[in-house]
Amino acid sequence: MRKILVTGGAGFIGSAVVRHIIRNTRDAVVNVDKLTYAGNLESLTEVADNPRYAFEQVDICDRAELDRVFAQYRPDAVMHLAAESHVDRSIGSAGEFIQTNIVGTFNLLEAARAYWQQMPSEQHEAFRFHHISTDEVYGDLGGTDDLFTETAPYAPSSPYSASKASSDHLVRAWLRTYGLPTIVTNCSNNYGPYHFPEKLIPLMILNALDGKPLPVYGDGMQIRDWLFVEDHARALYQVVTEGVVGETYNIGGHNEKANIEVVKTICALLEELAPEKPAGVARYEDLITFVQDRPGHDVRYAVDAAKIRRDLGWLPLETFESGLRKTVQWYLDNKTWWQNVLNGSYRLERLGTGK
């Protein structure tokens, strides 16, 4: 049985990883999360009482607390997902992204290195530091049909992607300089249950159910590759347990869709699954409202996931159609979860005008 320290385990992808490990493996999890606005322990209700699960409310920028957690739990691996991740928010509040994504990653690397250096030789050899990143570090594919491979040059476009690119470089440098056994993964856009409603898909679902406008940036033709979060969680666990030290693995869903197509598909699913509409709404699609594009908005991201398929045998199980249907149905069935989220300070709107 491994003990895996997961940072950001109360976030969207992190909670999916924690649920996957507790539900489908014999490994134990130590969840380290600061619990910012997007961290939600209600996403972990099913594992909260499991003896293989522990939670520590710790900020990765707090080195002393990280040292305590490593000493107390003595993990066999780290899966680093703690990050500020919303592009729109990074445009207006870049400092938070620099602090968490760069300084926080540095602190975690140093705490992990100090812990790793004093491990017994057998555990020392088996230890892994898995850094979870994004395809946005590669920049924009523009109008081409190309895919980002693991060797694509970095060209981040936003404060968010620049901060993640910086953290990727730190992780690789700690392997090359100090020998810390690191692995990096870069993923495409995730979606699925428990997604915080500032992101495109849950925002559209909840606004539509409330009869509010569905704000779409620019002409809506920006293309993203969509990855169901539970498929991603499987891939991440496979990488931390089977991946090769020093390697990078791109993880994608092979589901390229224009944003406007995604929104229209959500509307069509809601017509079927939630036909009783809010007052004054004839069709959900009538709520679509085009708004000013955000600064530096990338036209297209898409990753080539051939390497992880070839080397580790991972494939996504969900198509975009099956995954989106499951997601819409989950939000319809879990009103209490998202109402509790919305009762906080968050308001359903698109951010990122830079004003």
Swiss-Prot record:
Cofactor, free-text remark: Binds 1 NAD(+) per subunit.
Protein name, per record: dTDP-glucose 4,6-dehydratase
UniProt EC number: 4.2.1.46
Record-linked Pfam families: GDP_Man_Dehyd
Catalytic activity: dTDP-alpha-D-glucose = dTDP-4-dehydro-6-deoxy-alpha-D-glucose + H2O
Name of the encoding gene: rfbB1
A GO molecular-function descriptor: dTDP-glucose 4,6-dehydratase activity
Keywords attached to this entry: Lipopolysaccharide biosynthesis, Lyase, NAD
Cysteines engaged in disulfide bonds, as pairs: none
